[in-house]
Amino acid sequence: MTESNETPNTPEAGDESKHRRIKSFVMRAGRMTEGQQKGLEQGTPLFVLPLADAPVDYDQVFGRSAPRSLEIGFGMGHSLLEMAAAAPDQDFIGVEVHRPGVGALLNGVLTQGLTNLRVYDCDAIEVLNRCIADNSLDRLMLFFPDPWHKARHHKRRIVQASFAELVRSKLKVGGILHMATDWEPYAEYMLEVMNVAPGYRNLAEDGKCVPRPAERPITKFERRGERLGHGVWDLKFEKLA
């Protein structure tokens, strides 16, 4: 559900690939429904933001100053739409490269008449580095990222020490990094990374995972998993001064 991009870097790609940042995603083609195509055609000019070369003034983009959340890898956008609709006094930024997902979200924005949501359809790390000012986000959400199960692919996981450091620089003091996964080994891995990341406090009473926060909508995929006895692990970390 998190990100996507070009062909993954491999040694066979030549020497140039060795100097590229390893991506946590692979671009996959997908069929577009009529609604998704409509969303892209009508919603892109209104709600999709271009990569910038300097931090963006989102107060100007949204026409107000409000609490601001960013979700990396919103998939088909159901959760992000629900959160934005439920909190009209807050602003939301979604990042996703899967075109059908972007189209689905934009179609929902148009259908529901939402004005508090904007989208980037490119690499989330590029968005954080180039568009998001330091100390500006109230919350960053990473729900059900690709766990890259095989050990040789662990380097592709988005949650790394460098990611934790980058996110911390973008969060306000007291801002929250909220992650969720349905694969327990990945939850344990994320805890290992975050528990040694400087400048964070784990909000779980036991120092592990928090109960599912009410503000995170339950997806159809998650409900199906619950019926099958599958678990979901939520992690919340607060940025310290």
Curated annotation (Swiss-Prot):
Family the UniProt entry places it in: Belongs to the class I-like SAM-binding methyltransferase superfamily. TrmB family.
GO molecular function, one term: tRNA (guanine(46)-N7)-methyltransferase activity
Protein's UniProt name: tRNA (guanine-N(7)-)-methyltransferase
Catalytic reaction list: guanosine(46) in tRNA + S-adenosyl-L-methionine = N(7)-methylguanosine(46) in tRNA + S-adenosyl-L-homocysteine
Gene name tied to this protein: trmB
Source species of the chain: Pseudomonas fluorescens (strain SBW25)
PANTHER family per UniProt: 3-DEOXY-D-MANNO-OCTULOSONIC-ACID TRANSFERASE/TRNA GUANINE-N 7 - -METHYLTRANSFERASE, PENTACOTRIPEPTIDE-REPEAT REGION OF PRORP DOMAIN-CONTAINING PROTEIN
Pathway assigned in UniProt: tRNA modification; N(7)-methylguanine-tRNA biosynthesis
Its job: Catalyzes the formation of N(7)-methylguanine at position 46 (m7G46) in tRNA.
CDD domains per the UniProt record, alphabetical: AdoMet_MTases
SUPFAM superfamilies cross-referenced by the UniProt entry: S-adenosyl-L-methionine-dependent methyltransferases (SSF53335)
Composition-biased stretches (Polar residues): 1-10
InterPro entries, alphabetized: SAM-dependent_MTases_sf (IPR029063), tRNA_(Gua-N-7)_MeTrfase_Trmb (IPR003358), tRNA_methyltr_TrmB_bact (IPR055361)
UniProt enzyme class: transferase
Annotated active site: 146
Domain of life where this protein originates: Bacteria
Region called Disordered, residue ranges: 1-21
Cellular component aspect of the GO annotation: tRNA methyltransferase complex
